[in-house]
Amino acid sequence: LQQMAYIKTGRILHYLFSTINTVDDVDASLAKLEMEGLLADSDITAAKLKTMLDKRFQNRQVADWFSGKWTLFNECTILDYDPHDDSVKEHRPDRVMKNGDEVVIVDFKFGSPKPEYVEQVRRYMALTRSMGYSNVSGYLWFVYSNRIEQIS
């Protein structure tokens, strides 16, 4: 039962982060969650989420990602042709940010680290480079622990 609550909270947070462009959007995004009824049958409240977000934004790197200095692409789809099976695959990084020639890719995670997460971000980075961007960095952000892993 606790595991289910943990997963549900992770889904709520994932959705919440997709609606936050800058730190200034937090209150409106939390209000939207409440209006949409996403917190109605949950133990988590907007106040608890706000406290958690405030703590996460104290991390300098996270604060930078939500600073407003970036052109933001939330949940954007990157298409990839696979010649092996003649199919088009869709990839959807959680947050792609661009500032000048710099591109930063962040994937939010709410569980324990897994090797496939690293490969997932590496794939996003390779696809972004194939679009002509050379200055690309990628990160996994484990939101619950507020741990950031840079992917090389």
Residue ranges and their predicted role:
Residues 1-93, 97-100, 116-119, 137, ...:
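Nuclease catalytic cores
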Residues 126-152:
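Metal-dependent nuclease catalytic regions and adjoining charged, substrate-binding loops involved
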Residues 111-113:
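Short, surface-exposed beta-strand-loop junctions and turns on beta-sheet-rich folds
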